[in-house]
Design a protein with these regions (language model features):
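Hydrophobic helical membrane-anchoring modules
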Residues: 1-21, 26, 39, 165, ...
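Donor nucleotide-sugar binding loop of glycosyltransferases
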Residues: 30-33, 58, 87, 113
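Acidic helix N-cap motif at the loop->helix transition within catalytic regions
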Residues: 32-36, 60-68
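Short, acidic, metal-binding catalytic loop of nucleotide-sugar glycosyltransferases
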Residues: 39-48
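Short beta-strand/loop segment that forms part of the nucleotide-sugar
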Residues: 48-58, 79-81
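A conserved acidic beta->alpha catalytic loop
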Residues: 55-64, 110
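Residue-level signature of catalytic and energy-coupling elements of molecular machines
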Residues: 94, 109, 179, 204, ...
């Protein structure tokens, strides 16, 4: 497959030319490292792009550091997340603000290789719903990091590829590119940790959308404490690991399954990449509930139509 790195420019809302790539970076207490991460990204990405850094609070020193950068870099935005604290909510909010058709999620701690942002985006532009930077494919590797976490991640990734044909050997790595239209279609359910990567990989697998990968070399952070919490976030990872196995689902069936698990009263936020503007808290609760209700209703109608057609064929 030939990858084009210079596709025609997209036109966004209001007639403005949209960037080719939206880079989303969740950041918390990364003031000492975010500057180097931004330097590497802007030096590596030659295509039109926007970089969206999402923090939990303006009190985080990361906010001041990125704001100073943004004063001289028009492609950079620093936003305070409105969906709650934590990396999952920061990623969801950042993707909702993305103007490009491809969103690439990367970390602020310099563990990811920004030279791979454009190749990942090219895979999405060529039809993949999810493109993963894989530590466990040929040519990839992981340098440093907790041994237990690495073993679990490697086991999960390789078993999903072998048994579920997930499309990548590294479903758990957060360094991925996504089609924003695909995310609008399936939504994001994760609300804590970094489970979004495996969630969207599993959803793509179940609705039979393409998942692609390229090898990557992942470097453990040189300083500071990682925000990754293996035991606390394990249930979320296990949920999406198991979800990857199963029959093909339509987008409506997928939405109906998510609706059965939804708790809008506790999580009043619309799905990631909802194309409607951000609304007050109460309005967002209604939109979230309505989205799931409509999807579930559509699925019930389709099921009834299928049963009716089957009964008609039997009678004939």
């Amino acid at each position: 497959m030939t990858l084009s790195l210079t596709p025609p420019a997209a036109v966004g809302a209001g007639g403005l030319t949209a960037p080719r790539i939206s880079v989303v970076i969740p950041a918390r207490n990364e003031a000492a490292r975010i500057g180097r991460a931004l330097s590497r990204i802007f030096a590596s990405v030659r295509s039109s792009c926007e970089v969206i850094v999402v923090v939990d609070s303006e009190e985080d020193p990361t906010w001041q550091e990125v704001q100073a950068w943004a004063a001289a870099e028009p492609r950079l935005r620093c936003l305070v997340g409105e969906y709650g604290p934590g990396p999952a909510n920061a990623i969801r909010f950042g993707i909702d603000q993305a103007r490009a058709g491809v969103a690439v999620v990367t970390m602020a701690d310099n563990s990811d290789d920004p030279r791979q942002i454009e190749p990942l985006a090219a895979l999405v532009e060529n039809g993949a719903a999810v493109a993963a930077a894989s530590r466990y494919s040929k040519g990839g590797s992981q340098i440093g990091g907790p041994i237990g976490k690495s073993l679990l991640s490697r086991l999960a990734g390789r078993s999903l590829q072998l048994l579920a044909r997930a499309g990548t050997r590294d479903a758990t790595n957060s360094f991925k590119a996504y089609s924003t239209s695909f995310i609008r279609e399936v939504g994001i359910d994760s609300r804590q940790g970094f489970a979004i990567g495996i969630e969207l990989t599993a959803k793509a697998r179940r609705v039979r959308r393409d998942v692609a990968e390229i090898p990557t070399i992942w470097l453990d952070r040189e300083e500071g404490e990682s925000g990754f919490r293996v035991l606390a976030w394990m249930p979320a990872y296990l949920r999406w690991y198991l979800f990857c196995f199963g029959r093909r689902l339509t987008a409506g069936e997928l939405a109906a399954r998510c609706a059965r698990r939804a708790r809008p009263e506790a999580d009043p936020v619309p799905p990631a990449c909802d194309p409607t503007p951000l609304a007050p808290r109460q309005a967002r609760t209604s939109e979230w509930a309505a989205w799931h209700v409509v999807a579930a209703k559509d699925e019930l109608v389709r099921a009834a139509q299928s049963r009716g057609a089957a009964e008609s064929r039997g009678a004939a």
